[in-house]
Structure formats: structure tokens, C-alpha cells
Amino acid sequence: MLPYTLIQEADDRLRKRVRRTELIHSHHFSEKLGIPIYFKCENLQRTGAFKIRGALNFMTSQPREALAKGVITASAGNHAQGVAFSADLLGVPSTVFMPESTPPQKVFATRDYGAEVVLTGRNFDEAYAAAVQAQEERGALFVHPFDDPLVMAGQGTIGLEVLQELPDVANILVPIGGGGLIAGIATAIRETHPHVRIIGVETAAAPSAHYSLQKGKIVQVPVTVTLADGIAVKKPGVNTFPIIRDLVDEVVLVEEEEIALAIVALLERTKLLVEGAGAVPLAALLNRRVTDLSGKTVCVLSGGNIDVKTISVVVERGLVAAGRYLKLKVELDDLPGALARLATEIAEAKANISIITHDRRSKSLPIGKTEVLIELETRGFEHIQEVISHLQGVGYLVDVLK
């Protein structure tokens, strides 16, 4: 288990080095869910995620001579930036091994914090193996992303901050990847507030802790592509799993469309930009994955490092999940005014056209016909059915596109 004193010591070390992130009460989500909802905004942390807490606590706990040969880690995301920033802050050289498929913006961000970036391997596991080999050859310190007591203790300072600001908290929902974040937070909270309900949330695309708890031992699961790439971990840590098993009340799963909808909801209602991994606690609440909740409830928004190019895709998926986006294919007679008449009928159905594409050159079209692809803004699933029924009722052949 993780000693509570390690978290207290981490809090002392980090107090002036990391941001004490805001704990925000949300009136909108409190009314929607029927309980007081608060967000712990680690998306506003330095480097944009909680990972700096664990990385910096690990490094500042080492004797200076142990850091002389630098630090090494493997990561394709937030941990890379946390290690790079922490090393730069302490004047320590850092090397980060990243898979060759890592998006360029993450590579640039890590380099901007002063790290040497080595792109190697087809996936994280191959990059990790290369990092371990380099660490053994150089004698540098390896900073594990989650399965180290000092790293867990650093993440646990989030729990102390929540208790200091909201001592009567009743529930806390925490994302789970490798388990370092929830292990630290659970240890911090259970020490003085054993009655608090602690709930872990995973993506169904990487349910490693969920299935490990079901089996009663650590199991490795296949991981599929997910919006919550920051928690897409094949198995929990050797050190984190026993803490999750003993201190966490339950672990629930959320689906991809639910994550997308939560990202959009946070952006619209709180003006907070959160990455997929950070949105899973709210996704769990919005989709009633947790039952019988009462009292003040905290969602840990673990990070906000979402790829700019991904935002538009996520927003579109979130709008689809909320019934606020509809894409149609409609075949028209290739005659003057046909497109205008279609637009008029769409207006009659109270939908708003956002994008329209007119194609009369497709080989699949009969002579004298044209095809229109239309993207519409709608007001929910009931409105979508009204739009489709109206268009069909006036004679259009409508194909709903996914």
C-alpha cells in the first residue's frame, strides 16, 4: 500500500511548484443530475494535465547526484510533457522515448519543454522497451508513468486539495489508466474521510482495471482506438492494482460517443476544454453509470491536451450523440429550383443547413438526376425524426448517413 505520509511530503514539495487547480461548482450539471457537482480542473494545470505532480515529486525526492545522468521515460502523451517540464525546472537533462506514430504536436510540445525526444517503435510497448534499455546503458533514472510510490504520492495531492476545499465531499470520480492517479487520490481520501465513495472510470476501449477486479488479479486486455487515449492502458500496475482493489468502491465503463458528448457538454456549459480521458467522469454521470449518488460529487478533469485537429471530429461526434447533427443524402431532379425547394422544405421542418454539397457527376446517378449531401443542425432525436418524416412526406428519398 501507499503510505499516507508520502502524500503529505509530496504536498510540501509541490506546493510552490505546481498549480493548485480550481475546484469549480457547476450550477448547470448540478441541476441536470440532481446533486451538487464540482470539477477539479487539472486541465488547467501546468503542462495541461495532472502528470506533472507525480513526475516532479519523483524527481525532487531524489538526491542530486542521482539526477546527474538525467531522467528517461517513455510516453506518447501527458507524462512525457510532465517529465520534460519537471526536468527543465530542476535543470536536469531528460530523454523521452515516443512511438513513431506519435502526433507531431505532442512531439513538439515535449521538445519545447526541453526534452530530447527519441521516436522509436510502432507502439508504446516498443518505445517503452527502448527506453528501459537506454536507461540501463546510461545509468539515468527511469520515471515510471504510474507504477511508482513517489509518482502516486504526487498525484495523491489532488485528493488533499479536494478535502481542504470541500471537506464534506461525498463522492469523487477519477479516470483510470494505469491507476496511479486513483491510487494516490484514494489513499489521500481514505486516511481521513473513509466514508467518501470513490469511483473509477475507464473507457470501454481499455477496461483493464474493470476486468482485473472481476478476475481478482491483474489481467491484460486488448486496447482499441479511443478518444480517451490518455487512459488506454493494457493492464494496471503491480503497485496500483492492490490499492484500487482495496480502496476504490467501484469501477465503471463509458463508451466513445458518451465521452464525445461529455467533452462537448463541458465546452458548452463550463467553457472548459478537456481531453477524452479527462471527460470520462462526467460521461459516467451523464449516462447513469453510477447509481444511488447523493451529496457533493467531484469529477477529476485530469487533462486538457486534446489535439486541435481532433476537436472538430469530437464536437461532431458529440453533437451526433446529442441528436444535434444530421447528415443526409437526397436525390433530386436536375432542374432549376430543385435545390431551392429542398432548402425550403428543410426550413419548414425547422432545421438549419450548415453544409451542403451538390454532385451531378456521380456515375451511379441516372441521367437527369443530381445528388445532394446535407449537414443539418437539429434540436434532438425527436426533431431528427420530424425532419426525416417531413422530407419523406413531401416526396424525397432520404438516406441518413452515419
Curated annotation (Swiss-Prot):
PROSITE patterns: ACT, DEHYDRATASE_SER_THR. Pfam families: PALP. Keywords: Amino-acid biosynthesis, Branched-chain amino acid biosynthesis, Isoleucine biosynthesis, Lyase, Pyridoxal phosphate. The modification N6-(pyridoxal phosphate)lysine is found at residue 51. Pyridoxal 5'-phosphate binds at residues 78, 178-181, 302. It catalyses: L-threonine = 2-oxobutanoate + NH4(+); L-serine = pyruvate + NH4(+). The keyword Amino-acid biosynthesis applies. Catalyzes the conversion of threonine to 2-oxobutanoate and ammonia. Functions in the threonine-dependent pathway of isoleucine biosynthesis, which is the minor pathway for isoleucine biosynthesis in G.sulfurreducens. Also displays serine ammonia-lyase activity, yielding pyruvate from L-serine. Belongs to the serine/threonine dehydratase family. This is L-threonine ammonia-lyase. It comes from Geobacter sulfurreducens (strain ATCC 51573 / DSM 12127 / PCA).
